[in-house]
Amino acid sequence: MPITSSSETFASFFNDWLCRHRQFVQQLAHLADETTIVTPIEEESLVSNFLSHYLQYYEEKSVAMSVAGDDIYDFFSPPWLSSYEKLILWIGGFKPGMVFKLITTSVNDLTSHQIDQLESIRLETKRRERDLMRRFALLQQSVGDPLLMVPFRRIGVLRLGEGEQPEMEDAMEVLKVEMIKAMKNADQLRCVTVGKVVEVLNPRQSIKLLRAAGEFYLRLRDLGV
């Protein structure tokens, strides 16, 4: 029986997750409709359920990366994503600051206090994005281009001299650990940013934002498939 790789296992999870995502977006669109009569409790429940669904993706991804081995590089350019989805990748996922652009186009009833709060979150997010990107760039530069080197190692094209193989293996193990750390830090910022933004918004505004985000993602997905 063939052994299933970590990335293949996650790809299977992702396909199921994507089906649920489409269902959630339909629910968000229904509740976002101005003609839909809905209670605040129903709005809060859907927002909470969608955020749990969103976090599940990153929880499963974290587990998969922890046991990925050489497959860790698949998570930086995931084969389960479409070509259009890959166009917006930032350290293996969406750039956290994208949420603020979506707010601008989807939520038109922000109070002045909310605007100030969101601006503060945006600036902090931008600062952390720069910090993470700087560290990630240094990590890549430290080994040349590991994302190109590893596929060659897999098929035996890269020939090392006697005594160099153990050193290269050790270096690659350190690299994998650092790559996982970089991805998890980026994923944490993605989750924290969305969480902070939703805390500022009321349930109705959150539904509008999450609907816009969900539909934007599905458009990218469907265009590239």
UniProtKB/Swiss-Prot annotation:
Residues 7-225 form the DOG1 domain. InterPro entries: Seed_Dev/Stress_Resp_Reg, TGA_domain. The keyword Transcription regulation applies. One of its GO terms (biological process) is DNA-templated transcription. GO terms for molecular function: sequence-specific DNA binding. Keywords: Abscisic acid signaling pathway, Activator, Transcription, Transcription regulation. The keyword Transcription applies. It holds the Pfam family DOG1. May be involved in the regulation of abscisic acid (ABA) sensitivity. PANTHER family: DOG1 DOMAIN-CONTAINING PROTEIN (PTHR46354), PROTEIN RESPONSE TO ABA AND SALT 1-RELATED (PTHR46354:SF1). This is Protein ZW2. It comes from Arabidopsis thaliana (Mouse-ear cress).
